[in-house]
């Protein structure tokens, strides 16, 4: 397996977080986790996470839910079209060709279904940016779709709470950051979960991808991929090469987003990545994005004085990838 110390790395690093879930783990074991995660995030910005404690049956159920949804006829999926979401809540079905991540590329081929924390329709904040009730397909029973999905969503939030504690411990000592420096971002956060489907693309186009070359907008992303499918690639700047990220059994792929890079003044890297289309095989995945509390003002931790409001940053990035009439319909 490749490592970041290699001139030409062949894979992203692996971090076993289990010592942080074990009350009897030694101080040395926890320190090794901090070092491994710090090194991965300050070089590549990506790593495999193992020892996370999420049961395999829970992970498989989410992939099953993903397949159930995308097996629906188009008219059923369009009943939950994202343009029907309350206000600017940005929930529901994302048809193919909705996003363009880079000038000169054709729109992404992926289909998506986006959901987040449930906010009642009568709540004062419902309908504001990234906040509101989820749209659930009437043709799928709750016990086969919404219930397992929201149970999994809650587990993702708890897992990221552990990850950001490790990230805080890995910050430069001279910054004198408190150990709870990232805790605020997980309080009432924007935390979308996207179910994604990449249909086979018999005709390969050089300027079209499942997801084009991009960086994630938020703080921490957690990707669940179906075994037996390929496509994700990460850009490694020192060698100017794309490194494949194949599915590793029982693991998640974790990456830092733009907001984390801003917050840490570039110490933790938000890496470019893309999904290359497969000619013959369908691909399913379920990325979870911890954007953070949308009202949180993040002061650059190196003391440089830069301040970024999470919600303003996320909205601006969405406007860059979903423009024109589609953006207007979605309240961007």
Q: How would you label these PLM feature ranges?
A:
Residues 1-332:
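Peripheral, non-catalytic segments flanking oxidoreductase cores
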């Amino acid at each position: 397996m490749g490592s970041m110390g290699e001139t030409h790395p062949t894979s992203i690093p692996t971090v076993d977080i289990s010592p942080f879930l074990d009350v009897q783990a030694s101080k040395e074991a926890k320190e090794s986790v901090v070092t491994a995660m710090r090194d991965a995030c300050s070089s590549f910005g990506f790593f495999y996470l193992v020892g996370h404690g999420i049961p395999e049956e829970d992970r498989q159920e989410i992939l099953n839910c993903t397949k159930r949804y995308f097996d629906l006829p188009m008219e059923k999926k369009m009943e939950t079209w994202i343009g029907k979401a309350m206000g600017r809540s940005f929930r529901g079905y994302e048809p193919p060709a909705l996003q363009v991540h880079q000038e000169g590329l054709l729109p992404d081929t992926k289909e998506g279904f986006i959901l987040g924390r449930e906010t009642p329709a009568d709540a004062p904040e419902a309908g504001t940016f990234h906040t509101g009730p989820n749209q659930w397909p009437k043709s799928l029973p709750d016990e086969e779709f919404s219930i397992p999905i929201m149970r999994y969503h809650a587990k993702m939030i708890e897992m990221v709470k552990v990850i950001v504690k490790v990230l805080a411990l890995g910050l430069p000592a001279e910054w004198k950051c408190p150990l709870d420096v990232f805790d605020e971002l997980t309080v009432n956060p924007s935390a979308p979960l996207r179910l994604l489907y990449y249909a086979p693309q018999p005709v390969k186009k050089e300027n079209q991808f499942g997801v084009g070359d991009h960086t994630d907008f938020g703080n921490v992303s957690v990707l669940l991929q179906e075994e037996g499918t390929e496509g994700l690639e990460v850009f490694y700047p020192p060698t100017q090469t794309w490194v494949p990220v194949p599915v590793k059994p029982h693991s998640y792929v974790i990456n830092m987003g733009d907001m984390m890079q801003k917050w840490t003044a570039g110490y933790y890297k938000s890496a470019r990545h893309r999904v290359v289309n497969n000619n013959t095989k369908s691909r399913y995945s379920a990325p979870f994005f911890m954007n953070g509390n949308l009202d949180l003002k993040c002061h650059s931790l190196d003391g440089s004085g830069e301040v970024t409001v999470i919600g303003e940053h996320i909205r601006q990035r969405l406007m860059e990838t979903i423009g024109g009439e589609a953006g207007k319909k979605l309240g961007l």
